[in-house]
From Swiss-Prot:
General function of this protein: Catalyzes the phosphorylation of the hydroxyl group of 4-methyl-5-beta-hydroxyethylthiazole (THZ).
Protein name: Hydroxyethylthiazole kinase
Record-linked NCBIfam families: PRK09355.1
Pfam families, A to Z: HK (PF02110)
Cofactor(s) listed: Mg(2+)
Enzymatic reactions: 5-(2-hydroxyethyl)-4-methylthiazole + ATP = 4-methyl-5-(2-phosphooxyethyl)-thiazole + ADP + H(+)
HAMAP family: Thz_kinase
Organism: Acinetobacter baumannii (strain ATCC 17978 / DSM 105126 / CIP 53.77 / LMG 1025 / NCDC KC755 / 5377)
Gene designation: thiM
GO molecular function terms listed in the Swiss-Prot or TrEMBL record: ATP binding; hydroxyethylthiazole kinase activity; magnesium ion binding
Length: 275
């Protein structure tokens, strides 16, 4: 039977393993998020590589510890790289994370491409409530790439996506993790209302899940990354109330996280699965 204490122990072990191994994470991400994502990975103990050229994608994915694919600003060439890298990851047992930014009928081309990427079986699908709910086949009104649905509503609509991935991670006021590996839904609390106001925090979270997936199971990877962000957000908010100072202190705590902080501040709850 899964317990919160056992899960937190596994998160601490995953964090320790990432510090020891410095996993190489290939990021095919959007132009808005690339710099911030790379800095978050470096601060967390991983090694980012923003390789999104289709002519280099296959060879680089083969040597990567993990792959992160984010559809925030896809171009035709970048989409080719995504398809090549996702296929290569599946064939070479490289864990990979799919972040279906903006999925829905308004952005139809990227949504079609996202559907095609699902055939390569991502380890984790990560998104906001609207993206995940729409990807699961529900009709949801979104505001651009921002969610208009609460995460506690979305997780109850997302179980069908577990046919495509081992784990589904939904970010929001509380975060929810659905998994084929755990007999409960995991709710992660913490963070700050300022986090969504900083460009690319969600995108960087997806890449951090990929980094953790190089050293642990998909479920613990998603949980570790969400706890990592939740603790950093909570502690940063205790020191800063404005966006500029919060952003800087948040990155500091991304870097300063350790086993003691995880044990002290990780706030998770187990919920019954309601398919």
């Amino acid at each position: 039977m899964t317990s919160t204490s056992n899960l937190i122990e596994q998160v601490i072990e995953a964090w320790q393993n990432m510090q020891a191994k410095t996993p190489l994470v290939q990021c095919i991400t959007n132009s808005v998020a690339a710099n911030y994502t790379a800095n978050v990975l470096l601060a967390s103990g991983a090694s980012p590589a923003m390789i999104d050229n289709p002519y280099e994608a296959e060879s680089f994915t083969k040597i990567s510890s993990a792959l992160s694919i984010n559809l925030g600003t896809p171009t035709s060439e970048q989409m080719q790289a995504m398809q090549i890298s996702a296929k290569t990851a599946q064939l070479n047992n490289v864990p990979w994370v799919l972040d279906p930014v903006g999925y829905g009928p308004i952005l139809a081309w990227r949504s079609q491409m996202t559907d095609e990427l699902l055939q390569f079986k991502p380890s984790v699908i990560r998104g906001n409530a609207s993206e995940i709910s729409t990807l699961a086949g529900n009709q949801v009104q979104s505001k651009g790439v921002d969610s208009t649905l609460s995460s506690d509503q979305a997780y109850q609509q997302a179980f069908s996506l577990l046919t495509h991935a081992s784990c589904i991670a939904i970010s929001g006021e509380s975060d929810y993790i659905l998994s084929n590996e755990v007999d409960a839904v995991i709710q992660v609390n913490g963070g700050s209302p300022l986090q969504p106001k900083i460009t690319a925090t969600g995108c960087a979270l997806g890449a951090l899940i990929a980094a953790y997936s190089a050293v642990t199971t998909p479920t613990i990877a998603a949980l570790s990354a969400h706890i990592h962000f939740a603790i950093a957000g909570k502690l940063a908010a205790n020191q800063a109330q404005t966006m500029g100072s919060f952003s800087s202190i948040f990155m500091d705590y991304i870097h300063m996280l350790d086993a003691n902080l995880i044990e002290q501040y990780a706030d998770i709850k187990l919920l019954n699965k309601q398919a």
